Amino acid sequence: MKIGVIMGGISSEREISLQSGKSIIENINKEKYEVLPIVIDKKEDIINKSKGIDFALLALHGQFGEDGTVQSVLQTLGIPYSGCGPLSSAMCMDKDVSKSVLEANGIRTAPWINLRKGDNIDFNKINELGYPVVVKPTHGGSSVATFIVKEEKEIENCVSEAFKWDSEVMIEKFIKGDEITCPVYNNKMLPVIAIKPKAEFFDFTSKYQDGGAEEIVVELEAELHKEVEKMALETYKALKCEVYSRVDMIVTEEGVPYILEINTLPGMTKNSLIPKSAAALNIGFSELIDMIIQDSLKISR
């Protein structure tokens, strides 16, 4: 079977995607699969470079990769691919939409407002959220252009900076607590990982620099584990995820979990969280890649 490992892309997360692709190529079972690296430099590459492959193993992150666009193209070309479908990918990439779906399903997430380019900033609504707030691109990833804002005078600059990366910007109540990530694979939660960043929050540097954060598999207290698992699985289901995704949460000092966001194509670098979680179940990286390929092939699209 000829596997195209699709990486690169045109988003702000291109370099991380290339790292994910490289790690996958290094660890995939080459006795079982013929592997073709496919680097996307421009949008039409997904059509021109995917010809002749039997399966697309997606290592893309961010817009045009994680937002359902590439998934739709591959589906149109009749090429099976890894992970979530177009609708789920698009919903999870758009934090305003995903949070609206969560809220409609009674799943706890921080209150927020969403701005489009040209909208006036409603400072009264921001005051209702209460400072500090988080300002970030609505369709962003890897915490690029994400700011914790503690007072009103900082808002305009941070919103302007976030708009450099996206056509929409989210302003969300900052929830103080411990960040955890909950990988979900085929409707089952894998071991939870606690994230203790050296910075104020789990920013770009913390995520991708060696030693930027301490990431450890944790055993949560029984009641909290039960609630976290319920929320992770309900989120996976509500947003129509398939095969695997990563549900990120924040747990307050009082032990109340909130959904932060959902990653439909989580990182697959040596520092990445899903391989760490799978390793806690004695599932090696090569085996995990094989599972993702085989389970994705079972989906009828």
UniProtKB/Swiss-Prot annotation:
**Known Pfam families for this protein?**
Dala_Dala_lig_C, Dala_Dala_lig_N
Q: What protein name does the entry list?
A: D-alanine--D-alanine ligase
The UniProt record gives the binding positions of Mg(2+) 2 as 261, 263
The pathway is: Cell wall biogenesis; peptidoglycan biosynthesis
Residues recorded as binding Mg(2+) 1, renumbered to this chain, are 248, 261
Q: Which PANTHER family match?
A: D-ALANINE--D-ALANINE LIGASE, D-ALANINE--D-ALANINE LIGASE B
Q: Which HAMAP family does the entry mention?
A: Dala_Dala_lig
What Enzyme Commission number(s) apply to this enzyme?
A: 6.3.2.4
Q: Which organism is it from?
A: Clostridium beijerinckii (strain ATCC 51743 / NCIMB 8052)
Q: Which family does it belong to?
A: Belongs to the D-alanine--D-alanine ligase family.
Q: Which gene encodes it?
A: ddl
Q: Which GO terms describe its cellular component?
A: cytoplasm
Recorded catalytic activity of this chain's protein: 2 D-alanine + ATP = D-alanyl-D-alanine + ADP + phosphate + H(+)
Q: Keywords assigned by UniProt? A: ATP-binding, Cell shape, Cell wall biogenesis/degradation, Cytoplasm, Ligase, Magnesium, Manganese, Metal-binding, Nucleotide-binding, Peptidoglycan synthesis
| Gene3D superfamilies in UniProt | 3.40.50.20, ATP-grasp fold, A domain, ATP-grasp fold, B domain
Q: How is the cofactor bound?
A: Binds 2 magnesium or manganese ions per subunit.
> According to its UniProt record, where is this protein located?
Cytoplasm
Q: Which one of the record's GO molecular function terms can you name?
A: metal ion binding
GO annotations under biological process? cell wall organization; peptidoglycan biosynthetic process; regulation of cell shape
Please give the function described in this protein's UniProt entry.
Cell wall formation.
Q: Which residues form the ATP-grasp domain?
A: 99-294
Binding positions for ATP per the UniProt entry: 126-181
Names of the cofactor(s): Mg(2+); Mn(2+)
